[in-house]
């Protein structure tokens, strides 16, 4: 293959990599140095980039300097800056030097580790680091790789939930017969992430068989065991087959924590696969004072947390543990002739292709390994505790202002609050909170999001960006107060 100059292309030339790599690292370092100069939420309009880029790809090579100039002028204006210290909209998607270096190393090695033989280190390192994190979380030994359980890295919590739902579905169908699919019933609270709904659609679970159980402020939006028991009993009486329960530790809307032990007891006694989704809050549970929130996980069949949220590991890196790896492999294993090899055929190794939806997989364990080694567990605990401390401070600021109220008790580093309602005018209050959110986000100085709880529009301040300090939290509150004052007096 020749490029425009007649020279044969060498796409991984070591010297060019060294030259361009230095330029790219400098560019990224400068970006982080100046990240506060950008509006946190992109202010562009839909379709903006089509007007700035050509209709077709270049025929001949351009320089990296030209590309980076376009990144500065055309791409960065269309970026919402998730790593900004004033990003409070969603749960964090942490980046770090260690995570970045691990990602770089993974890209540089360029392996595809779908089976042990395709890169033994990729499989074995993944098993080791998932065991490391399981020990930090004090998970039961059944989730460790030395037995029939183990951990695997998925792309997202959505993939993790889909994988275990399919495993649970096939496990019960092997017992009751494949024609019973239309009788299978899934249970969750109305605070469970929409990923479960999508997983049910993919797995062929009829929407009428998805029990979305109502929660309210009396339990801080946690699922009541009584609600689950009543639903399961009704379905059994109707001749249906309860088979899957998804509980939450740190819901997306308000960080509600479901009572795992009580829910697990019901699930276990009825042969229901019990999955615990701790995508966000799982990271905090490496701190002894927050481990209580996953008490009862010993009753679960599977458990997931996102290292790419609050664990300084660049996206994507969702950690899933199961007690019975056979349930996964029986549901997801494929073994065409071109993938057969001695180690796999002899059952001597783990082939992670059979623990996930796709075949191909990146060397994602490298970045998690780098994070654990370059920071250590004690530093990670301090990092998480600092965000929780900042959230406590923000909560106190809100509580001291009579124009605002805290809607749900803060547990981790999310504060749910709103402008207080005018007497008997809840609808007007909701509109006013929407207006406040739009005003704050349009300023470009910070970015927040909202949710709805019991019909109330609630503002969410999720503290967790890697660069966030006390001054950013105080500045955010100052802007919120200023915009609120304008709305209340206009």
Swiss-Prot record:
Q: Which gene encodes it?
A: ELI5
Expression sites (tissue/organ): Expressed in roots, rosette leaves, stems, cauline leaves and flowers.
Any GO BP annotation: response to wounding
Name of this chain's protein: Phenylacetaldehyde synthase
- Extract the PROSITE patterns matched here: DDC_GAD_HDC_YDC (PS00392)
Instruction: Return the SUPFAM superfamilies for the record.
Output: PLP-dependent transferases
**Organism ancestry:** Eukaryota, Viridiplantae, Streptophyta, Embryophyta, Tracheophyta
Report the source organism: Arabidopsis thaliana
Explain the purpose of this protein.
Answer: Bifunctional enzyme that catalyzes the decarboxylation of L-phenylalanine to 2-phenylethylamine, which is then oxidized to form 2-phenylacetaldehyde, a constituent of floral scent. 2-phenylacetaldehyde is a precursor of 2-phenylethanol, another constituent of floral scent. Catalyzes both the decarboxylation and deamination of L-dopa to 3,4-dihydroxylphenylacetaldehyde (DHPAA).
This protein's cofactor list reads: pyridoxal 5'-phosphate
Enzyme Commission number(s) of this protein: 4.1.1.109, 4.1.1.107
The residues listed in the UniProt record as binding L-phenylalanine, with positions renumbered to this chain, are 92, 193, 308, 338
